[in-house]
């Protein structure tokens, strides 16, 4: 999700917010424009767009909790066919924690999950029911993985697009939750 700013097509105006208090976050800097004091919530250096605003995290979360965020892009450990998301804890393992994810799933109008389709050991992360503690309940409608773009509709993942070189059959094999292949599945375009 932190890479989103690098992939916004030219001519499209988007105002990205970082939870730590930057509205108007730009893409990752090159060596000439790097500023070690300009970071996102993940502590990665970023740039600021013209007209950006910098404020404290309390103000940032007031915007998020107040419903002033149109869209959020989150990573996840698991998503299920009911639109539930687990993104903050794996029992018995050290992970960074939830950060602002619970605020974002409750306060943003739309949520897109961006994640790998399978875990490091090859197990599907798209499940009939999440097995990990939930971050949000019934709030996810769209999931983008390294294999596919899926929507969650009526208790099923609906396959809408496949990544270049990926077949619908591969997505079927690697999805544990109920999956419906749309009649008009197409290949993702990156231009």
Where are the regions a protein language model picked out?
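Conserved phosphate- and dinucleotide-binding cores of soluble alpha/beta proteins
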Residues: 24-191
